[in-house]
């Protein structure tokens, strides 16, 4: 697809499509592939060119390709791990990214008030449900945890906040350290020094089996675990916003980059500023437990780096609430 044609397409309203509908197929042919329409006929050369522009990974199988270049979903396939993967129209991704970052800004705007509400909720009985779920939300805020999924814990041995076990927490003086293998086999080490949270964590680990679920509430002699849906529901209730723990990760990655760039002496050369931006992204990636490439493409609001390039940063801040307010102000000027 030519650049001009692509530019024209972005002005055309996208169509919502389903991979359950008629589509094109990719089939093995020697060392490459053949592309067939819904009737099994070979695609025209210009159609093949459009499919190749989608850069569908060669390892994908059972590939469905949208016949309409305006479809919001352009291709679907199954990767080597058996997971369904999706290729979306770039304009659809752009709009989704804008919505994601705008949603994160609104989260950041409301976070200071939410932390005040959480402080009250964290004063309850440390093994009662209200308190434990509040502790989970605060841990997401402080530690940038993924919530995790039962299937990943059982099948891959990878954990998130709601699937962590008692054995994943170690005491180190006045700190509690979470050490575990997360999504993608990445080793995580998250240090918590908040005194109120530590009191709750200690109550949840005391006299319990090492393989017991950390985030659980005591009902008589039984411990009942907290799941990701319950934590996300509390997040939405507190923020009065349709967000999840993942939006916290987007916001925390963005504020981490903004703070790093505010604390460096801005380089005078373009290459120097690019290096400083890379270093800020690396810091966010470490917090997230992702690669710098993923952190930059999926989590950090690009406007923070663009503003830094133009000479705008948040200045120095002294508190987490101050950081949130400063980044919101920077991004909404």
Which positions does each model-derived feature cover?
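DNA/chromatin major-groove-contacting recognition/catalytic segments
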Residues: 302-328
